[in-house]
């Protein structure tokens, strides 16, 4: 009985002495879209006419309550836009040398089997570096011109922020 009482006291004191590590230990989180915004708060990204995808970096800076950078801060990202791969992703040209040491192309192999594969327009996860910087790449494609990409960032405690990016 005494052992049971000691065990109970130990377990209760252990439970009461534990800290809640889910508290928001950060002070500020500032996003930098690196885009101009209009009067309605929509950001505008000009799509490339020379490439299928337009790559663009979105950043955020996270600092604690003492204005120090927070390292290894986890952030999840998602977007409302996706695109689909066709049947052929690309090709490889096999080249060799002749007896005269001249390059010749003797075969082309097509990389297939990706038909219908869904491709997101945003990376999914990022962690802050030692400077508190978080980075995410978005990559809309030309066929999305005129659409609005809604980029959502989610982090600790169920917090989130959504940014509207018009694809021009």
Predicted features and spans:
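The feature marks long extracellular or luminal low-complexity segments
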Residues: 18-168
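Sec-dependent bacterial lipoprotein signal peptides
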Residues: 1-18
């Amino acid at each position: 009985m005494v052992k049971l009482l000691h065990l109970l006291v130990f377990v209760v004191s252990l439970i009461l002495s534990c800290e809640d590590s889910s508290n928001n230990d950060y002070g500020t989180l500032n996003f930098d879209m690196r885009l101009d915004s209009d009067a309605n708060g929509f950001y505008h990204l000009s799509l490339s006419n020379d490439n299928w995808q337009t790559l663009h970096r979105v950043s955020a800076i996270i600092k604690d309550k003492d204005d120090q950078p927070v390292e290894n801060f986890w952030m999840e990202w998602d977007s409302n836009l996706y695109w689909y791969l066709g049947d052929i992703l690309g090709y490889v040209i096999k080249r060799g040398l002749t007896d005269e040491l001249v390059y010749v192309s003797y075969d082309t192999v097509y990389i297939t089997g990706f038909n219908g594969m869904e491709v997101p327009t945003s990376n999914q996860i990022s962690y802050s570096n030692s400077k508190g910087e978080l980075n995410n790449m978005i990559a809309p494609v030309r066929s999305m011109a005129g659409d609005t990409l809604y980029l959502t960032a989610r982090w600790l405690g169920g917090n989130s922020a959504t940014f509207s990016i018009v694809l021009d």
